[in-house]
Every structure is written in structure tokens, then in C-alpha cells.
Amino acid sequence: MKDRKFSRAVAIVIAFVICFTGGITLLAFKPVAIAEAISTTEGTKLDYSDGSHYEGDVEAGEIRNGTGSYSWSTGETYEGTWVNDVQSGNGKMVWPGLGTYTGQFQNGKRHGRGAFTWIYDGEPTTGQPISFDGEWEDDHIGSSGKMVFANLGIYEGGFSKGVREGQGTFTWDNGDQYFGMWAKDRISGDGILTLADGSLLEGQFNNNLLNRGTVTYAVDGGIATRNVLNGKLQSAVTIVYQDDTTVVGTLKGQEFVGNVTISYASGDSYVGALKNGIKSGKGTYTWKNGAHYVGEWSNDKMSGTGKYYYEKDESKNYLCGTFKDGLPLGTLIYVSDKKLQYNTVWQDGKCTNITYKKK
């Protein structure tokens, strides 16, 4: 007999926080003045009636072309390249106390590759965006990029209309990581969530929850796998231990209920009840050579009334009676291969007397 104490399965949470608080607020790009300058200095400095200023390259006296800096009367600044009097090419835009953008512009708008860094009055709250580095389209976050969230983690992947969409990876500060599909800024679609402790949630997610799939997590000395259906963790479990022992059963809380099936690396198997992770109640243990015991168990050993069959065939060659601590005890009936019956007396696992039993 091979003694084995099975660990209790651990509970696992399949809901998790992913969204930042509120939405992403992108500062609108302010247009530059197009009115005539009220003053010029050496053809490189322009002052406008709305209080804004430009310093840099110009053509035909007032057309901004080349490299230059522009400041609004409200404090915003732009420094970079200009084409035909609008920001185009590489540049830097600063909103005092709010944020900074460094990257590409086209026709006066953020367009192409660029990075935006938010600025907060004090420390940002958990989940607020800190920075975005990626593609921009028509002054909005484009199709892909990397966004960092305060005290939460980093997202890299697809975007649509400024929110996470399509395939992307979110890595939490605590080491958890999700790779898969997103929809409307939520985890939705096929994906894999790997927790820092090695647990794995894989399947179809909906609104940040695993809706259908599998959950794999560690138990003492092994790995457990359970299904998730309609967002609920199912009670059926398969546990594979490091020594290649496999347990298949049903959990209620952290305990097995009903019969379990245990397959050992040696080729032996057990089908029956467990209590506190050990064989207890009624069960059948089958050895690789076909011998098997059917009966009562206690403390992981044959104990109580049972039958020990010396071979696969249950019609002959078996011992019937009382067992204790894995051994036959007292008087048991032995049925031979010729279907003859004998009274046998056992002590300390040894047969001390045999008498023919008349029918």
C-alpha cells in the first residue's frame, strides 16, 4: 500500500480590478493665432493681438516655416517644426500643471508617434494615467501604444478612440499579467491571466471576468485545474502532483465530496471517499497486477469490513472479513481458485491457522 495525504485545494478569485478611475482626459490642442502680428523683430519674433508670441523661422515676413516656439497668453507652449504656418513634424507641447506631449504633429494636431505625460496637483490617485507613448491620429490616441497607470501597472497594445481595444497586455505592479483581447477599455474576449503566484486563468473573458475557461493553481506538492462556466468556478477538479499522482474529484469549499479517482505513477489506483485529504469511508484500491481491495478505509488504510482479491477476477481467490491498519485481522474467509472456502486466522498480517469450511 502506498500512503498519500492529499492537500486541500485552495480558493481562487477570478474577478480583478483593471480599469483606471474615470476616463482618459486629453487636453485639446489649442490653435495658434492666424491674425496679423502686431509687431515683428528682425523677422524672427511675432507678437499677436491675443497676447500670444512666436519666435523662430518665418517666410514672407509672417508665415511660420522651419523651427520655432509659440506661447499662448494662457501659458501653453509649443516648440518644434512648422510647415505653412501650422505645427507639422516633431515638436513639444506643454500645458502648465496638466501635461506634456513630445512627438509628431501634422496640420497643427498630434499625429504620428508621440508621448504624453499627465501632470497632477500632488500625487495621482491609483489608476489614473501617468503617461502614454504610441500612435496618435488627428489629435487623439491612435491604434496602439503603451500607457502607464499610477500605482497599478502598464498596458501595451491596441487602442480605439482613446480606450484599450483589440489585443493588449496589462502588467500589474504586483507581478500579475494579462495577455489577450480588450473591448471598450475592459478585458473581453480570449486571453490569459497569469498571477504572480503562478496561478493561470485562461479562456474567454467578459467585462473583466473569466466567463468560460480554466483556472490552474498550485496546491501543496501539485497543480490543480478547474473549469469556469458562466463566470462561476466549477467544483470538479483535477490535481497532478509532482510524483505524477493524479486526483480527479469534486470539491465543496476546500474538501473533496463523493468519490474521487486517484491514479498513481506506479500504475495503482484508488476510487472512493476521502476525508481531510486521506482515504476514509468506502473505496476500492487496485494494484497494477490486478489485485484489489474493496471495502472500508480509515486513516488512509484498509480498516473495517472488506474483500481483498488476489487477482482481477472477483469470482475466486479472495479474502473476506475484517481489516485493520492495512492488514487482515482475526478470522476471515478465504475463497480459493477452486471456489473452496476456508476459515483463516490472521495476526500482525500473518495467517496463523487455516481450516476447511464446510458449506
Positions of PLM-derived features:
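N-terminal Sec-pathway targeting helices
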Residues: D3-V13
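Generic secretory/membrane-interface signal
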Residues: K2, A15, V294-W297
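Hydrophobic helical h-region of N-terminal Sec-dependent signal peptides
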Residues: I12-I18, G22
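Glycine/tyrosine- and acidic-biased, solvent-exposed loop/turn segments at the edges of beta-strands
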Residues: F20-K359
